[in-house]
Regions:
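Short, acidic/polar
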Residues: 19-36, 139-152, 241-252, 276, ...
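Boundary/entry segment of secreted carbohydrate-active catalytic domains
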Residues: 1-26
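Carbohydrate-binding surfaces of carbohydrate-active enzymes
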Residues: 200-201, 205-243, 252-721
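Glycine-rich, aromatic-flanked loop segments that form ligand/cofactor-binding clefts
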Residues: 10, 38-48, 76-127, 159-164, ...
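Aromatic- and glycine-enriched glycan-recognition loops and surfaces
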Residues: 17-38, 62-90, 143-144, 210-214, ...
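Catalytic domains of carbohydrate-active enzymes, especially glycoside hydrolases
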Residues: 25-54, 155, 254, 258, ...
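Active-site-adjacent "subsite" loops/lids of carbohydrate-active enzymes
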Residues: 20-21, 94, 98-155, 172, ...
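Aromatic- and acidic-residue-enriched segments that line the glycan-binding/catalytic groove
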Residues: 55-71, 98-128, 163-194, 243-250, ...
Length: 721
């Protein structure tokens, strides 16, 4: 097993413009401190700084043909520090800034810059970090970058992290991109964003391919010097807007050794407490080891460490979801809140118990699809989706219902679709985590007959853009006994976002006919249960999602929920039940399909209405066979369970985010007497990993049952079979 396939605990110690101060430090003590106090085993060391005014062209080490960073003229940081890092078991990766360069340096290479569609340099119109520009992966700059990579590897380091390059929005229209696109597609670059233009979609793919090819050639250059070296860049997370900067882990992972993405804390951002967990689970869906990047900082106040419980919670969520943590510490680190202790507590635990994080396999039988195809190419056919609806808030006797005007701008329409998908993923994720449902995230490439054999239930949260082969694999999965839960426009478009006329697919979902979209409106529209279903009694009113299709179900389809007739305004009397079903349940072969004409997941993701989450989770539970694990605990307790087959044991991770209702979190409220039931006929021993205390258990009807007396923030329970 390669070192990077084992649990890795990464750190970057950031000195900003004062990086030269390290030449006066005791380098051995520096390495020892990071290993023994912070418990890392991998360090990012700055080789080409990412500091103002864009000094990525300078190096902190001897590199033939490259300018030295001031203060390093007679000091080779990498060659000096590397022996001490290795002495203390720290793998050394070099940080190379590859996206931010000063205007002065760019003037020496005017044909390297990324150009926007107006033929102006991107950095001129959008100065990077207020001052600086960026270069194109198809320009001769790539050869300059590959030389820097080779010079870096000659120092003997273990690998490289590339901070960039980034293919920025509306880029690139330089001569090299023009020539390459013309050679590849036989046409000139499209002039503007136009999702009805096939060339625009080709341009989107061209940008991603260009970045992937740069990484491929960067990896090749690195391995010419050290065949065992590792290389990776920030390949982007789950967010649907990733196409705007050509990020796609499925494209990049063939040429890198980690799939990494940022999940920084910002005090004003309205992020879920499970944001880091979500990023970790998404990244582990790839084929490569995952790493989640966290600043150990109070948002943009970089020299003040993040509140202790926030950083501990983030690190626990990362390792519990089988990803690797990375923290950036900014020097000098203020001591007014806490220094190394919160980080050392979690990373020290992971270091001490590394064997329990090795070679684990998921026990999840539910798969949730996060579709890069959809996030990139989805543009709904329904124009009423693009009306300004306002927020639905009523304050001071004024109701915000928007202007009702139709958005016609392509860029704005695309943003609306991205927002819907963004909230769909969040809504689906939160619903399942908060209901203690075990699930995996799967990517587009996983929608194959072979991969789907691992699961009982497949959830497609508006996976609108699916290829013919993907649709066939899904139908085969259900025909052989699998269960499907799909919503809204799932499968209505091909993998490039082109509208399909696939009547068989709609019949597969239980649809006889789609009439139109209900008038979108925030508030005062409802669904009702026409039978007892999913915990809702008959005639129960349920909030209707804003985006809802009006469909007719095919014969023999069960329809337990119906929409009420739409109301054009609030404070109006209900008009009775419509003829349009709100949920379609049908059989297909040996399996079952549940289809929601509404964007249920997006509705919960944006509005957090509990009845919607209840509907989502109860449908998934209804489709599942007997649950592998059941837990009686507050919804803010996350559970992840894995099996170590070689050691014949289950690993149960419990993360408690029950806090004081604001972020940054100041207090975690302990949860007591958590009842857990695990589907297992027999077991030898159950114990807490932190103190090895045994936990009493009982056998009952093919399951074992036990109680966790108290959960503070993070606990690992071992079940030996």
């Amino acid at each position: 097993m390669n070192w990077y396939e084992r649990p890795v605990r990464m750190m970057r110690w950031e000195y900003m413009q004062n990086v030269s101060k390290m030449k006066d430090m005791d380098l051995e003590q520096l390495a020892k401190m990071k290993k023994e106090d912070w418990h890392i085993n991998c360090e990012w060391f700055v080789g080409a700084p990412g500091v103002a005014p864009g000094l990525g062209f300078q190096t902190t080490f001897k590199a033939e043909g490259f300018e030295r960073y001031p203060g390093f003229e007679n000091f080779d940081s990498l060659r000096e520090y590397l022996p001490y890092a290795h002495k203390y078991g720290i793998k050394l990766l070099v940080y190379l800034n590859m996206h931010w360069y000063s205007y002065e340096f760019a003037k020496k290479h005017p044909d390297w810059e990324q150009l926007i569609s107006s033929a102006e340099p991107y950095g001129k119109i959008h100065p990077l970090y207020g001052n600086g520009t960026t270069f194109c992966v198809n320009s001769p700059w790539r050869n300059w970058a590959f030389r820097l990579i080779k010079e870096t590897m000659k120092t003997g380091v273990d690998g490289i992290f590339l901070d960039g390059p980034v293919v920025f929005s509306d880029c690139c229209y330089c001569q090299y991109c023009e020539e390459k696109f013309k050679k590849t597609y036989g046409e000139n670059l499209p002039e503007k964003e136009d999702w009805q233009n096939f060339l625009w979609k080709d341009f989107i793919e061209f940008r991603r391919d260009s970045l992937a090819e740069f990484l491929r050639d960067a990896q090749k250059a690195m391995k010419e010097i050290n065949s065992e070296g590792v290389i990776f860049l920030n390949a982007g997370g789950w967010q649907p807007s990733g196409w705007r900067v050509a990020r796609d882990i499925e494209k990049m992972q063939d040429y890198q050794d980690f799939n990494g993405a940022e999940e920084f804390f910002h005090p004003k951002a309205e992020k879920s407490i499970l944001a880091t967990s979500m990023m970790a689970k998404y990244l582990t869906a790839g084929m490569k080891p995952a790493v989640v990047f966290n600043h150990y900082a109070m948002g943009s106040w970089h020299y003040i460490p993040l509140m202790p419980l926030e950083i501990k919670l983030a690190l626990a969520q990362i390792i519990a979801n089988r990803a690797n943590p990375w923290i950036c510490v900014f020097d000098p680190l203020a001591k007014n809140i806490g220094e190394k202790e919160p980080v050392a507590e979690v990373l020290g635990f992971a270091e001490e118990n590394e064997e329990y994080y090795l070679k684990t396999s998921s026990l999840a039988k539910v798969a949730v699809h996060f579709s890069r195809q959809t996030s990139t190419y989805y543009l709904s056919q329904y124009t009423s989706l693009y009306k300004d609806l306002g927020t639905g808030k009523e304050e001071g006797l004024v109701l915000d219902q928007g202007t009702g005007k139709l958005v016609v701008d392509w860029e704005r329409r695309k943003s609306i679709n991205e927002s819907l998908l963004h909230h769909s993923y969040i809504g689906c994720y939160l619903s399942l985590i908060r209901s203690h449902t075990l699930f995996d995230i799967i990517l587009d490439k996983n929608l194959t007959s072979e991969k789907l054999k691992e699961y009982e239930v497949l959830v497609l949260p508006n996976s609108a853009c699916l290829s013919e082969n993907q649709r066939k694999a899904i139908k085969e999965f259900v025909r052989k006994g699998g269960k499907l839960f799909a919503s809204f426009e799932t499968g209505f478009y091909d993998e490039k976002g082109n509208l399909l006329e696939d009547k068989e697919w709609k019949e597969f979902l239980g649809i006889e006919e789609i009439e139109d979209l209900f008038p979108p409106m925030v508030g005062e529209n409802y669904m009702t249960a026409t039978e007892e279903f999913a915990g809702f009694p008959k005639s129960q009113l349920i909030e209707r999602p804003i985006q809802t299709l009006k469909v007719r179900a095919k014969k023999s389809t069960r329809t337990p929920l119906f929409y009420l007739k739409p109301l054009p305004k609030i404070y109006m009397s209900l008009q009775g039940v419509s003829a349009s079903p709100a949920l379609l349940i049908s059989k297909y072969g040996k399996g079952k399909v549940v289809y929601s004409p509404s964007l249920l997941e997006a509705f919960y993701g944006e509005y957090r209405i509990e009845s919607t989450s209840q509907l989502i989770t109860q449908i998934v539970k209804m489709l599942s066979l007997e649950e592998i694990i059941k837990m009686d605990a507050p919804s803010a307790v996350e559970i992840e369970v894995y099996e170590q087959k070689d050691s014949s044991r289950y690993i149960i991770h419990l993360i408690n985010a029950t806090g004081d209702m604001q972020r940054p979190i100041k207090e975690i409220i302990p949860v007591r007497n958590i009842k857990i039931s695990l589907k297992l006929k027999q077991t030898r021993k159950i114990y807490h990993l932190n103190n090895k205390e045994t936990i009493p258990f009982v056998h009952k009807k093919g399951r074992i049952e036990f109680v966790i007396s108290e959960l503070k923030l993070y606990e690992v329970i071992i079940v030996e079979k």
